[in-house]
C-alpha cells in the first residue's frame, strides 16, 4: 500500500489517477498516524521549498518522513517533493530540507555556457539520459519526460544521480540511494517513461514488503 502524503502543496489528483492506471493500491492522508500503515510513500509537490518545509514541520510530517525513510520504507519525491529530499534550498532565502540526500537546491540559470538565453522556468519535454540501473529505471530505458521547475539540485553525490536532462546545466532528473528516490519531472504526466517509474516503484514497494 502506497501512502500519498498530502500537505496542501501537491498535485494529488494527477498522481492518484496515475496510480489507479497501474492498479497500485494507495491512499491519501495528511496525518502521520494514518500514514504509518503504508508500506511506502509518495511525496508530491508544487510551489515554494520554504513554504513546503514550514507546513511539513508544523504538521509533524517532517519528522515522520525522516523516520519512515530511516526505517527503510521506500519513498518517492516528485518535482518539489524531490527537492525537499535534499539538505537545503536557496529559494526565498536559505532553508533546510529533509536531509535524506546530499545536495543543495539552486535556481536555474537563464543562459547556457555559450550565452544562449534560456527560459526559466524550464517547462516542457526534455530527453532523459540514464546513468545507471536502479529500482526505478533501467539504464537502457531513455525517453522524454515533462518538466516544470525553476530550481534544480546542485552538488548531488555521483552515485545518487540516476538520470539527468540538459538545460544549460546538468539537471538531476531521477535521483536515489537505498530506499529514497525522486523525480524532478512529473512521472504522472510523462507518458511511457513516467508510468514505468511509477510501475517500478509499485514493484519496489512490494519487494521491500516481502523482505520484511
Curated annotation (Swiss-Prot):
<dbReference type="GO" id="GO:0016829">
    <property type="term" value="F:lyase activity"/>
</dbReference>
<dbReference type="InterPro" id="IPR010139">
    <property type="entry name" value="Imidazole-glycPsynth_HisH"/>
</dbReference>
<feature type="active site">
    <location>
        <position position="186"/>
    </location>
</feature>
<dbReference type="InterPro" id="IPR029062">
    <property type="entry name" value="Class_I_gatase-like"/>
</dbReference>
<dbReference type="InterPro" id="IPR017926">
    <property type="entry name" value="GATASE"/>
</dbReference>
<keyword id="KW-0368">Histidine biosynthesis</keyword>
<feature type="domain" description="Glutamine amidotransferase type-1">
    <location>
        <begin position="1"/>
        <end position="211"/>
    </location>
</feature>
<keyword id="KW-0028">Amino-acid biosynthesis</keyword>
<feature type="active site" description="Nucleophile">
    <location>
        <position position="79"/>
    </location>
</feature>
<feature type="active site">
    <location>
        <position position="188"/>
    </location>
</feature>
<dbReference type="GO" id="GO:0000105">
    <property type="term" value="P:L-histidine biosynthetic process"/>
</dbReference>
<dbReference type="Pfam" id="PF00117">
    <property type="entry name" value="GATase"/>
</dbReference>
<dbReference type="GO" id="GO:0000107">
    <property type="term" value="F:imidazoleglycerol-phosphate synthase activity"/>
</dbReference>
<keyword id="KW-0963">Cytoplasm</keyword>
<comment type="function">
    <text>IGPS catalyzes the conversion of PRFAR and glutamine to IGP, AICAR and glutamate. The HisH subunit catalyzes the hydrolysis of glutamine to glutamate and ammonia as part of the synthesis of IGP and AICAR. The resulting ammonia molecule is channeled to the active site of HisF.</text>
</comment>
<protein>
    <recommendedName>
        <fullName>Imidazole glycerol phosphate synthase subunit HisH</fullName>
        <ecNumber>4.3.2.10</ecNumber>
        <ecNumber>3.5.1.2</ecNumber>
    </recommendedName>
</protein>
<keyword id="KW-0378">Hydrolase</keyword>
<comment type="pathway">
    <text>Amino-acid biosynthesis; L-histidine biosynthesis; L-histidine from 5-phospho-alpha-D-ribose 1-diphosphate: step 5/9.</text>
</comment>
<comment type="subunit">
    <text>Heterodimer of HisH and HisF.</text>
</comment>
<keyword id="KW-0456">Lyase</keyword>
<dbReference type="GO" id="GO:0004359">
    <property type="term" value="F:glutaminase activity"/>
</dbReference>
<keyword id="KW-0315">Glutamine amidotransferase</keyword>
<dbReference type="GO" id="GO:0005737">
    <property type="term" value="C:cytoplasm"/>
</dbReference>
